[in-house]
Regions:
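Gly/Pro/Ser/Thr-rich low-complexity, intrinsically disordered segments predominantly at protein N-termini
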Residues: 1-168
Length: 168
């Protein structure tokens, strides 16, 4: 289980500054930070939100032993990252909650929905960061709705939610 290091503490403290700023709370973007604590803004189009909603709905319906959450912040070695959707069991949630805010332990599944602003170099970096933070699987949804599943390596289907479709 990832622990809270000095670097993680700095990222968590910076994140608390950001979420406490009333001007930043009103931004219509996903907010993340890089390894220096600088704010990274990611605007997205409506299709992105539709895909997030579809993923959350499917997880509620077919992965009842856990619960999905949208835009969940995770403290990583490279700053605070915010997967579009996460899924975790109640047991993992207790563990996650014990690692600070934002947590240093990732939920079991982290999902990134790609937009025009993303490329595969960024996705591969996020897959690595989420896995290092404890995610068992990372799913990447391409703009056409194709879902790619990653654990140690890329896999054809999710092992945690085997009924999840390969396209949404």
């Amino acid at each position: 289980m990832p622990t809270t290091t000095t670097s993680a503490k700095k990222h968590q403290e910076r994140w608390q500054e950001i979420v406490s700023d009333p001007h930043l709370r009103e931004l219509p973007y996903t907010v993340e930070t890089n390894y220096r604590g600088q704010i990274v803004l990611s605007p997205h189009q409506a299709d992105h939100s539709y895909l997030q909603g579809d993923i959350i709905g499917f997880l509620y319906e077919h992965a009842k032993e856990g619960r999905p959450f949208p835009e969940f912040p995770i403290t990583t070695d490279e700053g605070v990252k915010v997967p579009d959707v996460v899924w975790m069991t109640a047991r993992r949630r207790e563990e996650v909650d014990g690692t600070g805010d934002p947590p240093t332990l990732a939920p079991e599944i982290c999902v990134e929905v790609m937009s025009e602003a993303n490329d595969w170099d960024e996705m591969e970096a996020k897959i690595d960061l989420y896995r290092k933070a404890g995610a068992e699987e990372v799913w990447v949804v391409e703009q056409d709705g194709t879902v790619r599943f990653f654990a140690e390596d890329e896999q054809e289907r999710s092992t945690l939610v085997p009924d999840f479709p390969t396209s949404v």
